[in-house]
């Protein structure tokens, strides 16, 4: 459920959208790109456990958990970046990831930091 009690001075996860505008609000100022980057690696133990899971097929829960945590941390870093410039919303939010080495993955969360007002 969206928290509608928060002040428009606050940037809450409820004011982050993949759309190009925030429903019920008007964008009054664009503050530029906000981003959060996290680089994660698999541990030897985790890699071994995941290798065992691949034998049986299906969801590899160790990697799923690692990916979820990396996205969550990147999202939180993006929120912090947007707060630094005074944003109260983020539009056009996206995730991207790249393997930058053996077992090392970069996850980036980015969007446009904006100031919105009720429409």
Swiss-Prot record:
Belongs to the UPF0145 family. It comes from Burkholderia lata (strain ATCC 17760 / DSM 23089 / LMG 22485 / NCIMB 9086 / R18194 / 383). PANTHER family: UPF0145 PROTEIN SCO3412 (PTHR34068:SF2), UPF0145 PROTEIN YBJQ (PTHR34068). InterPro entries: UPF0145_dom_sf, UPF0145_YbjQ-like. Gene3D superfamilies: Hypothetical protein apc22750. Chain B (3.30.110.70). HAMAP family: UPF0145. Pfam families: YbjQ_1. This is UPF0145 protein Bcep18194_B0595.
